[in-house]
């Protein structure tokens, strides 16, 4: 099965390994992502006519909204960016403008393509790095030597390369020439200013400018890898492919969309700039051209997924034009005690497995009794009911509290197997059991 060619059923099966429940949300998102692939198989003229059906996900924090979209984008190798609507300001105000989310998507897309090209050239890059270091470690062969000497040198070079690959010479120091560290560019400024910045930097910081550095062989490997990658990769082709991929397959996840909804409940306290951000967002979601440092990008075929809890507002509090641009609505269920238990026991990379792996590094074995896991799920669920509902994130705070002493004094438990019982969970979370001092468990 190719990741790019996953069917909706295969996508949902993949998501089931990491996210419990939320069948309707998984199904809707899987179809939307599959339609990205279907559209690209059509004739060019028909491709232009088909625009993505943007999705509005409604559900409390910690129920899996972001994780569903992020997981699919990752497995399907699609350009993806997650942003928070509340971080943007209306044009004319101090802060980030909404177009910067598209520029962030393009940056991620170019990086994705660059990493793919590096992976294809991985062996070639590593060979070039090892050869360059080996030649630095071996004294150069004088001119006019016999064929026999040349062969001996070639054999010595080969042996040296093998030792470098095996890490035998990692601590040896060598002097190499590396490019001067490039000046950081603020990608949040408008593209016109970005281009001016880049031109100024190129003028004062020519590519051939290099400095000599004494590094260990291990450090030299990394320094040369980055430099040789730049010489072997076709930068322009990568930029063009990244721009094209963002335009045709990009996904922008806008979290906290409810924070810019103008709620009637707020009365006179409402922020007038919220509606301004919505109106700035509208042309991007509808389809417009945004200038980036890599060139202009059309946004009409980018898939937008908006998400929010909508505790203090309703989806209908968004301006009607923006509501119309998110025709698919999915409501995610709040997490029950049973689902909390399943999250701890059935997901591929459950929180329990993560903590077991972390403590195994210190030589500490951790085992959870089933009753202990059920108690963790129960107490986490109760905490969500009695204070702010933060979904599965509550499990992180409760497990962290239970394992806090073991994590802190891990060296004292090295070589031991520790069993987490129901009684231990209750004693560590006694404030939670007694419904006291809940603030400790609120993120």
UniProtKB/Swiss-Prot annotation:
Gene Ontology biological process: protein unfolding; proteolysis involved in protein catabolic process
Subcellular localization: Cytoplasm
CDD domains xrefs: RecA-like_HslU
Organism: Helicobacter pylori (strain Shi470)
Protein name: ATP-dependent protease ATPase subunit HslU
Assembly, per entry: A double ring-shaped homohexamer of HslV is capped on each side by a ring-shaped HslU homohexamer. The assembly of the HslU/HslV complex is dependent on binding of ATP.
GO-annotated molecular function: ATP binding; ATP hydrolysis activity; peptidase activity; proteasome-activating activity
Keywords of the record: ATP-binding, Chaperone, Cytoplasm, Nucleotide-binding
NCBIfam families: hslU, PRK05201.1
Biological function: ATPase subunit of a proteasome-like degradation complex; this subunit has chaperone activity. The binding of ATP and its subsequent hydrolysis by HslU are essential for unfolding of protein substrates subsequently hydrolyzed by HslV. HslU recognizes the N-terminal part of its protein substrates and unfolds these before they are guided to HslV for hydrolysis.
Family: Belongs to the ClpX chaperone family. HslU subfamily.
Keyword Transcription carried by entry: no
GO cellular component: HslUV protease complex
Pfam families in UniProt: AAA, AAA_2
Protein encoded by which gene: hslU
PANTHER family documented for this protein: ATP-DEPENDENT CLP PROTEASE ATP-BINDING SUBUNIT CLPX-LIKE, MITOCHONDRIAL-RELATED, ATP-DEPENDENT PROTEASE ATPASE SUBUNIT HSLU
Residues annotated to bind ATP: 20, 62-67, 255, 321, 393
Broad class of the protein's primary localization: cytoplasm
